């Protein structure tokens, strides 16, 4: 009987963990987002060759966020990070209209992978502070998100440097995690 209460207590009050993979084309803002969430400040970044990994504590959830470099030569390495991923954050530079088609191709290629079949998808439409940035509805359309079937997804307009929208995205991820457990 005590075990039932113990597991109930842990379910209600215990810390949950969620493995998050954050990917996107190079210069989309992934590393800036990671360290804004982790440190609450803007850091000077250089192109990520390989990955950064940090644990972000938010609303009693421990998010382990893997930020993987987005340069085209290293994108084939993304698949090595797919295993056990519960949430996928795909970061898009909303100001980069020339490469949004390329972003769509990479996203669809990843979502076709069997190891990501159960992962929820959060899209950060980043760089909303720039005057020519596409809004979330336009990014949704350009990425073809409405065509996704059998996958929970959400798009959040963000500005990594100010932090706008980042925690709203984590709220959605944490609610998805709670609904699955």
Curated annotation (Swiss-Prot):
Positions with a binding annotation for GTP: 24-32, 126-129, 160
GO cellular component terms listed in the entry, alphabetical order: cytoplasm; endoplasmic reticulum; Golgi membrane; plasma membrane
InterPro entries: Arf1-5-like (IPR045872), P-loop_NTPase (IPR027417), Small_GTP-bd (IPR005225), Small_GTPase_ARF (IPR024156), Small_GTPase_ARF/SAR (IPR006689)
Membrane-related topology note: Lipid-anchor
Tissue-specific expression: Expressed in hypodermis, intestine, spermatheca, uterus, gonadal sheath, vulva cells, pharynx muscle, body wall muscle, head neurons, ventral nerve cord.
Catalytic activity: GTP + H2O = GDP + phosphate + H(+)
SUPFAM superfamilies named in the record: P-loop containing nucleoside triphosphate hydrolases
Keywords (A to Z) from UniProt: ER-Golgi transport, Golgi apparatus, GTP-binding, Hydrolase, Lipoprotein, Membrane, Myristate, Nucleotide-binding, Protein transport, Transport
Ways its activity is controlled: Alternates between an inactive GDP-bound form and an active GTP-bound form. Activated by a guanine nucleotide-exchange factor (GEF) and inactivated by GTPase-activating protein (GAP).
Subcellular location: Golgi apparatus membrane
Enzyme class, first EC level, given as a word: hydrolase
Main location: Golgi
EC number: 3.6.5.2
Family listed: Belongs to the small GTPase superfamily. Arf family.
Record's function text: Small GTPase involved in protein trafficking between different compartments. Modulates vesicle budding and uncoating within the Golgi complex. In its GTP-bound form, triggers the recruitment of coatomer proteins to the Golgi membrane. The hydrolysis of ARF1-bound GTP, which is mediated by ARFGAPs proteins, is required for dissociation of coat proteins from Golgi membranes and vesicles. Involved in endoplasmic reticulum dynamics during embryogenesis. Also required for adult germline function.
Protein name as it appears in the record: ADP-ribosylation factor 1-like 2
Organism of this sequence: Caenorhabditis elegans
Encoding gene (name): arf-1
């Amino acid at each position: 009987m005590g075990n039932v209460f113990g597991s109930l207590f842990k379910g209600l009050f215990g810390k949950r963990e969620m493995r998050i993979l954050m990917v996107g084309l190079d210069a989309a803002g992934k590393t800036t987002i990671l360290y804004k969430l982790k440190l609450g400040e803007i850091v000077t970044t250089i192109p990520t060759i390989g990955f950064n990994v940090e644990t972000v504590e938010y609303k009693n959830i421990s998010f382990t966020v893997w930020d993987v470099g987005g340069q085209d030569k290293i994108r084939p390495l993304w698949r090595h990070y797919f295993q056990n991923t519960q949430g996928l954050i795909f970061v898009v530079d909303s100001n980069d209209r020339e490469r949004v088609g390329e972003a769509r191709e990479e996203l669809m290629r990843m979502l076709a992978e069997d190891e990501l079949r159960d992962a929820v998808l959060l899209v950060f439409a980043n760089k909303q502070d720039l005057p020519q940035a596409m809004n979330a509805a336009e990014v949704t359309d350009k990425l073809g998100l409405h065509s996704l079937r059998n996958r929970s997804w959400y798009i959040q307009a963000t500005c990594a440097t100010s932090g706008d929208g980042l925690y709203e995205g984590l709220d959605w991820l944490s609610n998805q995690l709670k609904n699955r457990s």
